[in-house]
Amino acid sequence: VIVACGINPSYGKYDAYNMALSVVDEALRNLVAGGGDIRHAALLDNFCFASPDRPEVLGDIVLASRGCYDAAKAYGVPFISGKDSLNNEWTDDKGNRHPIPATLLISAIGVVEDARRCVTMDLKRPVSDLYLVGLTRPELGGSEYLKLLGLKTGVVPGVDLRTAPRIMKAMQRALRRGLVLACHDLSEAGLGLAVAEMAFSAGIGAVIDLTFIPYRGGIPRPDFILFSESNTRFLAEVKPENARAFEQNFTGLPWAKIGRTISLTKLVINFRGKKIVDLPLRRLRQRWLRKAV
């Protein structure tokens, strides 16, 4: 049995519908990355909102519910239970009300057919290929990157409900065939955080190039590519001898070989012939721990 979750209240501040789509997608891609199968999975919801007596809150509940419905229909994964926690707000000593943002926690539960085929997210060895599966867009509304910059703008990530289930099933197939050494879904802070976590968790370095990443939505900016939080994306480590089979597995879907693992304990990121990041894993891990704590 495998259990996975998805939640992002930052999205709920701006777009309750796409927040719901995003957290369902996050729960399912976490389930897939861990070795689960969405064909044998189910969903549970937990609605956490302010007072539904306020029209804007009730509207967000309706939009989030619609997002849950659309996602469940698209993925073919049913909701089997759920709960709500409403009226989450408080009043300060000046009489000002402070509601929580629209928040939806999605839990996915499924079955792992063969636990021996499960992989973890840490890199496994030097001289492997790194693949990014899924399409990147300039979707940064509610993102960790814009929060760091103090900006309240941008588009909350949506979900391509036609393509997303195909990507999930293709990744399941690749994992089931033993083509993947390590797998990490892309969520908060996007590719930048995912590749860093995979590298410093194992003490194995990586070199990636943002130039080759499938990108749609205007002029590519390296910071947007690196920190976009577009949904339905995976970063996978693959043995060179399995590269061809892995690529054929994703025929007709967006993917790119974006780099490789290296024996040096550092992360290098290039874009259009220029090195934009060259940092030791030790420093990345220290900064990550500082943020996590």
What does each model-identified segment do?
Residues L132, Y145-C183:
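A glycine- and small/hydrophobic-rich beta-loop-beta segment
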Residues M19-V23, I167, L191:
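Catalytic-loop motifs flanking and including active-site residues across diverse enzymes
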Residues M19, M121, M168-M171, M198:
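Detector for methionine-enriched segments
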Residues V57, A64-A71, Y75, I80-L105, ...:
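Glycine-/charge-enriched secondary-structure boundary and capping motifs
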Residues V1-P138, S143-P157:
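Glycine-rich phosphate/pyrophosphate-binding loop regions near the starts of catalytic domains
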